[in-house]
């Protein structure tokens, strides 16, 4: 069986540090996620073209805009590529696209001008260049949170579940049950004993070892602890920033604590 190459393509802070993963084989290329802005999408196009491979597949691993707003640029450059996502992700994208455009209106010309609607992934795997990428994750409390597992290369493409060097985005998981389920998914991910791990959000050039799993889990546990012993979001935020003074993506701790404390709605 031919070997695959994996490359993480980082995005700037202004794009919430959202990564994409470029997978290449002897002939073809696959992208996992499509960038937050149109500029992100154009950068992905440049990277794919530099490989000289044919882009056949774009898997959108989650329904938040930083996972797919750049898809328009990718589709324009590679009109024959298939865009795929799970059924919950497709539903989420369709239901929230217009409201997310309004929420991120300050991005102006970086916003997409049309929706690229992914096809629903048939089954629970993607076969690329003869290699199976298994869809893992999801839970009763987190039905739309998946990751990809490639057994032959022992690779985890962690998507929305993994952060590295950043505050973890918890605004979309406002309940303790959801965050506990998230930790369970991380435990299952670690049990696979991966040797290459891609975080969905990370500081540029972070390592591709188990650290993203460890960091995300430790942060979620600390988040729960500080929520339990602080009176309001401001105090919880201060406590988390004191624990993790070096982390980026501070908007995540600001919004996450407010949502968890019931001081604002998000979604």
Where do the PLM segments sit?
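Divalent metal-coordination and catalytic microenvironments
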Residues: 23, 33, 48, 62, ...
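Short acidic-hydrophobic surface loop/beta-edge motif
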Residues: 23, 123-128
